[in-house]
Amino acid sequence: MADQRMDISSTISDFMSPGPTDLLSSSLGTSGVDCNRKRKGSSTDYQESMDTDKDDPHGRLEYTEHQGRIKNAREAHSQIEKRRRDKMNSFIDELASLVPTCNAMSRKLDKLTVLRMAVQHMKTLRGATNPYTEANYKPTFLSDDELKHLILRAADGFLFVVGCDRGKILFVSESVFKILNYSQNDLIGQSLFDYLHPKDIAKVKEQLSSSDTAPRERLIDAKTGLPVKTDITPGPSRLCSGARRSFFCRMKCNRPSVKVEDKDFPSTCSKKKADRKSFCTIHSTGYLKSWPPTKMGLDEDNEADSEGCNLSCLVAIGRLHSHVVPQPAGGDIKVKSTEYVSRHAIDGKFVFVDQRATAILAYLPQELLGTSCYEYFHQDDIGHLAECHRQVLQTREKITTNCYKFKIKDGSFITLRSRWFSFMNPWTKEVEYIVSTNTVVLANVLEGGDPTFPQLTASPHSMDSMLPSGEGGPKKTHPTVPGIPGGTRAGAGKIGRMIAEEIMEIHRIRGSSPSSCGSSPLNITSTPPPDASSPGGKKILNGGTPDIPSSGLLPGQAQENPGYPYSDSSSILGENPHISIDMIDNDQGSSSPSNDEAAMAVIMSLLEADAGLGGPVDFSDLPWPL
């Protein structure tokens, strides 16, 4: 016993003595004790539970049943979730089959993309929702062909289908021959833009364009991150598939050209007129519709681009739009007068035309823009309208013209009556433009002698009758220019420009004189313009019409080359003697404004002769020797 005690004490002393490994052993011992405690506790609990199970077999059975119930509940939940996912997938597949854009896809789409396309399809159909479907339009006793013939007969036009991507004519009815004189085989497969007027191509492209085919609007696949090719994307309702379209455009008419031979004019002009295709105004009404390319049965040039995309087309009926001339109102029924509004520059050129002018004049607004109004006035009315032009530029009051004739598109004339007023810039105190309200005058009003509408015979004389015809010789006749119907004056577009320059020159002279400091530059009617004896002055006849002195023209120039309207610079003055300014001064060495105008007239003659619009140019009118 003593030896055993000694061994125990020595062991304890060795254990308690400090050493290099004491700290490590102590830390390990401490953690080991804790672990042993935990293990002992857990083993004790497990032992107690085992003892309890041995003692109570019912508790062990309940534990097993509890574990079984948990396992069964998990399996039932998994089955429920699986059935829910399967049902949701079946619904999404069914939804994808109902949406046209998803149905046309070559690959399977993810769920998010299908839902997006379905939402966009519902937005597209929202604007076209009606209590009746497309099939209900047609009665049951009518076939599709019979309905098509009835619609074409009632519309008095032709049916056409145009692809929105390239403007290709996919279908056109046989009735197009009655309007455009083209057969059905001539147009199918061709580009619509080849038969449109160049100024109307951009307008038609705007009508054909839709956000359906815009690449920047395509959806993104949630899985791959790549853009999804689709034909239905968010956008304004008027740009979605199924939106209605209504627009005017000019299309070529295959009319047989009439060969006109005139030896008095260059052959180049007649060739240009003969080769030029005539156009007619077509009113197209329809809507955009999409079909999958597999249902169209068409050969696409680029299958890679068309794969997975619907074919968006314009289905429309084209009708020949003829200008409307109002019928006389019978009895005491008062109807609103037919009128349109136009805006002109100070030289008379159109800068804005109301859309109502198309129904009255048969011109589209873009046809009139940039042209002078004097090109459409009858030559008998130019004198009165030129005087009104001067008055509206000099006063702030509204000027009402007499009834005058205006040339419409078919070459005939319509009677109009206009109210003009000028708009002055409040800062620059200069006239910016002229606003004209043009009213159609009915034939019965002219015949009845209504005092509010003066007779055409009561208008001032033409500009030729206001001026002397020459040195006692006969009055010069106006040559007929190819392509310009009779009744209008050749080169009349220069009249407005010369009137504007005349008024601006008077304003400049009055503005520079000391006596005009206290007066407005517009109130120039009280003081007469400068006399022709002054350098660069102009001699004005009654009504403000400038005269040409006899010394301003060379002898015999007024009778030379009567067949060529622009043979030389003097012929330009001879065509419009009523608005011509004294371009040639007696002193040819002075640098007056008239010399500059004479030089400009010679340059214009050179340009016209180079373009084939005139004959040889006579340089004798130049104010300086060559």
Swiss-Prot record:
<keyword id="KW-0804">Transcription</keyword>
<dbReference type="InterPro" id="IPR036638">
    <property type="entry name" value="HLH_DNA-bd_sf"/>
</dbReference>
<feature type="cross-link" description="Glycyl lysine isopeptide (Lys-Gly) (interchain with G-Cter in SUMO2 and SUMO3)">
    <location>
        <position position="252"/>
    </location>
</feature>
<dbReference type="GO" id="GO:0090403">
    <property type="term" value="P:oxidative stress-induced premature senescence"/>
</dbReference>
<feature type="modified residue" description="Phosphoserine; by CK2">
    <location>
        <position position="90"/>
    </location>
</feature>
<keyword id="KW-1017">Isopeptide bond</keyword>
<dbReference type="InterPro" id="IPR035965">
    <property type="entry name" value="PAS-like_dom_sf"/>
</dbReference>
<feature type="short sequence motif" description="Nuclear localization signal">
    <location>
        <begin position="36"/>
        <end position="41"/>
    </location>
</feature>
<dbReference type="GO" id="GO:0043161">
    <property type="term" value="P:proteasome-mediated ubiquitin-dependent protein catabolic process"/>
</dbReference>
<keyword id="KW-0090">Biological rhythms</keyword>
<dbReference type="GO" id="GO:0007283">
    <property type="term" value="P:spermatogenesis"/>
</dbReference>
<dbReference type="GO" id="GO:2000074">
    <property type="term" value="P:regulation of type B pancreatic cell development"/>
</dbReference>
<dbReference type="GO" id="GO:0051775">
    <property type="term" value="P:response to redox state"/>
</dbReference>
<feature type="modified residue" description="N6-acetyllysine">
    <location>
        <position position="538"/>
    </location>
</feature>
<feature type="compositionally biased region" description="Gly residues">
    <location>
        <begin position="484"/>
        <end position="493"/>
    </location>
</feature>
<feature type="region of interest" description="Disordered">
    <location>
        <begin position="511"/>
        <end position="596"/>
    </location>
</feature>
<dbReference type="InterPro" id="IPR013767">
    <property type="entry name" value="PAS_fold"/>
</dbReference>
<feature type="short sequence motif" description="Nuclear export signal 1">
    <location>
        <begin position="142"/>
        <end position="152"/>
    </location>
</feature>
<feature type="compositionally biased region" description="Low complexity">
    <location>
        <begin position="17"/>
        <end position="32"/>
    </location>
</feature>
<dbReference type="GO" id="GO:0046983">
    <property type="term" value="F:protein dimerization activity"/>
</dbReference>
<dbReference type="GO" id="GO:1901985">
    <property type="term" value="P:positive regulation of protein acetylation"/>
</dbReference>
<feature type="site" description="Important for interaction with CLOCK">
    <location>
        <position position="125"/>
    </location>
</feature>
<dbReference type="GO" id="GO:0005634">
    <property type="term" value="C:nucleus"/>
</dbReference>
<dbReference type="GO" id="GO:0051726">
    <property type="term" value="P:regulation of cell cycle"/>
</dbReference>
<dbReference type="GO" id="GO:0003677">
    <property type="term" value="F:DNA binding"/>
</dbReference>
<dbReference type="GO" id="GO:0032922">
    <property type="term" value="P:circadian regulation of gene expression"/>
</dbReference>
<dbReference type="GO" id="GO:0042753">
    <property type="term" value="P:positive regulation of circadian rhythm"/>
</dbReference>
<keyword id="KW-0677">Repeat</keyword>
<feature type="short sequence motif" description="Nuclear export signal 2">
    <location>
        <begin position="361"/>
        <end position="369"/>
    </location>
</feature>
<feature type="domain" description="PAS 2">
    <location>
        <begin position="326"/>
        <end position="396"/>
    </location>
</feature>
<dbReference type="InterPro" id="IPR001610">
    <property type="entry name" value="PAC"/>
</dbReference>
<keyword id="KW-0597">Phosphoprotein</keyword>
<feature type="domain" description="PAC">
    <location>
        <begin position="402"/>
        <end position="445"/>
    </location>
</feature>
<feature type="cross-link" description="Glycyl lysine isopeptide (Lys-Gly) (interchain with G-Cter in SUMO); alternate">
    <location>
        <position position="259"/>
    </location>
</feature>
<dbReference type="GO" id="GO:0050796">
    <property type="term" value="P:regulation of insulin secretion"/>
</dbReference>
<feature type="domain" description="bHLH">
    <location>
        <begin position="72"/>
        <end position="125"/>
    </location>
</feature>
<dbReference type="GO" id="GO:0016605">
    <property type="term" value="C:PML body"/>
</dbReference>
<feature type="modified residue" description="Phosphoserine; by GSK3-beta">
    <location>
        <position position="17"/>
    </location>
</feature>
<keyword id="KW-0963">Cytoplasm</keyword>
<dbReference type="InterPro" id="IPR050933">
    <property type="entry name" value="Circadian_TF"/>
</dbReference>
<dbReference type="InterPro" id="IPR000014">
    <property type="entry name" value="PAS"/>
</dbReference>
<feature type="region of interest" description="Interaction with CIART">
    <location>
        <begin position="508"/>
        <end position="588"/>
    </location>
</feature>
